[in-house]
């Protein structure tokens, strides 16, 4: 029996779908104004493994991951780039798909855009107004009134409410309650910024952040879904506000289970564009195979925080390499079994770990037990048993999107990446030594380093500020 930790109840619960055999799941997507970073990748890989496992269990899963394609950050970035918001978002959506496809992340069944659901959003707001859960602020914005929701903040725990940011408290004339939030933002078309806006009963404007997910979710799935997911940074205010809007509008529980993935940390802080503390997926793909990144991002339990650093990625690559080495010289195309019911034992153990709130670290330990057994069988020359064990290893790893490559091809790829990374590190070290030599007026040494780099195919460009740029010839 599958058990899932529910953020709403703060405990693991037996998973019982609303409709037998079918699951409706909604995961909050990205705001498409820039390339996705590794923190986004962690959330999407977590839920990708969840969806793969649910489908393996025989469920018919309908998966929605939204796209926020209108937002202040989008408007600002489009203006800076001298392009329309639509040009920017269309380009970033394509880039997002390239990155997520590279990580073997399945595409959702539906990928709704905010700009394609404005009418639905307006109707949703009208319903909240008619039920007296929303009001017009003095500046023309439509606000949700949190005082009309008897248990507002239930997800983040209203007995210990999150700290209200100072900038919220500094707007006393706009909100009836400092926690009230925008449903519809009144705007006027700004030719300079090319700011998009839509007609509504309240004048020109655009939707607030929180209403978008409630409305799009409702338009696809109706009043209630099985699972709502996202990063733990969305618990408050986004998911608390989604619950408030949806429960007040339709008087249902909205989502039966709330799942949240832990944050990816860089320098002990959340990996985030707003903190300028991130690496893009594209950055990391230059140095590591996509499957290594996927393996790393599932190496901690999905609810736990995960620390990013180069050593942890290298360790993940070494671990994944061990599994592929075990698969070497096998042909795992036969049915998964290890003989003497070994295969069945490992399969049962793997399933029990995944049934315990999708415990991928424990599931990994089963994969390594299989790899160890497989290596022993190969050493002892039990080729038929080894083939069965290899099939079991590949079968189980495939459930969570791993070991889908040819072992020889994977091992050659990471060797090439490793050599390239070492070459890159050597170049950086030589350039740093040359910069020190120049600062110390050691011109002969600086020139000899330049010549060495030239032989390696590197062209240097010394800038007027003392910064040296380089590129391959």
From Swiss-Prot:
Top-level taxon of origin: Bacteria
One Gene Ontology term from the biological process aspect of the record: cysteinyl-tRNA aminoacylation
Family named by the database record: Belongs to the class-I aminoacyl-tRNA synthetase family.
Cofactor: Zn(2+)
Lineage of producing organism: Bacteria, Pseudomonadati, Pseudomonadota, Gammaproteobacteria, Enterobacterales
Catalysed conversion reaction: tRNA(Cys) + L-cysteine + ATP = L-cysteinyl-tRNA(Cys) + AMP + diphosphate
Catalytic class of the enzyme: ligase
Keywords on record: Aminoacyl-tRNA synthetase, ATP-binding, Cytoplasm, Ligase, Metal-binding, Nucleotide-binding, Protein biosynthesis, Zinc
Placement of sequence motif 'HIGH' region: 30-40
Motif ('KMSKS' region): 270-274
GO cellular component terms, semicolon-separated: cytosol
HAMAP family according to UniProt: Cys_tRNA_synth (MF_00041)
UniProt cross-references to Pfam families, sorted A to Z: DALR_2 (PF09190), tRNA-synt_1e (PF01406)
NCBIfam families: cysS (TIGR00435)
Binding site for Zn(2+): 28, 213, 238, 242
EC number of the protein: 6.1.1.16
List of residues binding ATP: 273
Species of the source: Blochmanniella pennsylvanica (strain BPEN)
CDD domains recorded: Anticodon_Ia_Cys, CysRS_core
Subunit structure: Monomer.
Location within or outside the cell: Cytoplasm
Name of the protein described by the UniProt record: Cysteine--tRNA ligase
Entry GO MF terms: ATP binding; cysteine-tRNA ligase activity; zinc ion binding
Gene3D superfamilies xrefs: Cysteine-tRNA ligase, C-terminal anti-codon recognition domain, HUPs
């Amino acid at each position: 029996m599958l058990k899932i930790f529910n953020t709403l109840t703060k405990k693991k619960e037996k998973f019982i779908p609303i409709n037998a055999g079918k699951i409706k799941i909604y995961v909050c997507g990205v705001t498409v104004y820039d390339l996705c970073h590794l923190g986004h990748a962690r959330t999407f890989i977590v839920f990708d493994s969840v969806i793969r496992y649910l489908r393996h269990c025989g469920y018919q899963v309908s998966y929605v991951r939204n796209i926020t394609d209108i937002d202040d950050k989008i408007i600002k970035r489009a203006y800076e780039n001298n392009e329309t918001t639509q040009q920017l978002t269309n380009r970033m959506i394509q880039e997002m798909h390239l990155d997520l496809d590279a990580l073997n992340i399945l595409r959702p069944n539906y990928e709704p855009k905010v700009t394609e659901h404005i009418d639905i959003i307006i109707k949703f707001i009208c319903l909240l107004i008619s039920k007296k859960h929303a009001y017009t602020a003095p500046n023309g914005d439509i606000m949700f009134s949190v005082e009309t929701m008897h248990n507002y903040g239930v997800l983040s725990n209203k007995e210990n409410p999150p700290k209200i940011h100072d900038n919220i408290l500094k707007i006393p004339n706009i909100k009836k309650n400092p926690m009230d939030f925008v449903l519809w933002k009144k705007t006027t078309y700004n030719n300079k910024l090319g700011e998009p806006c839509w007609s509504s009963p309240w004048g020109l404007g655009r939707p607030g952040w929180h209403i978008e997910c409630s409305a799009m979710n409702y338009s696809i799935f109706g009043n209630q879904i099985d699972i709502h997911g996202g990063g733990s940074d969305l618990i408050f205010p986004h998911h608390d506000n989604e619950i408030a809007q949806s429960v007040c509008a339709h008087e249902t529980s909205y989502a039966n289970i709330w799942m949240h993935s832990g944050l990816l940390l860089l320098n002990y802080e959340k990996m985030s564009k707003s903190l300028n503390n991130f690496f893009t997926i594209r950055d990391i793909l230059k140095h590591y195979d996509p499957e290594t990144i996927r393996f790393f991002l599932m190496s901690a339990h999905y609810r736990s925080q995960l620390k990013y650093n180069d050593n942890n990625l290298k360790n993940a690559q070494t671990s994944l390499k061990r599994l592929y080495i075990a698969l070497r010289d096998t042909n795992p195309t036969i049915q998964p079994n290890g003989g003497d019911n070994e295969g069945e034992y490992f399969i049962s153990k793997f399933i029990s770990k995944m049934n315990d709130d999708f415990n991928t670290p424990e599931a990994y330990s089963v994969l390594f037990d299989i790899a160890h057994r497989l290596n022993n069988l190969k050493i002892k020359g039990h080729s038929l048993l080894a083939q069965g064990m290899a099939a079991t290893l590949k079968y189980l790893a495939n459930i969570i999107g791993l070991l889908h490559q040819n072992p020889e091809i994977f091992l050659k790829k990471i060797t090439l990446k490793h050599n390239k990374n070492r070459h890159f590190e050597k170049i950086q070290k030589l350039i740093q030594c040359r910069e020190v030599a120049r600062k110390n007026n050691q011109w002969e040494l600086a020139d000899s380093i330049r010549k060495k780099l030239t032989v390696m195919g590197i062209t240097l460009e010394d800038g007027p500020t003392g910064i040296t740029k380089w590129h391959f010839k």
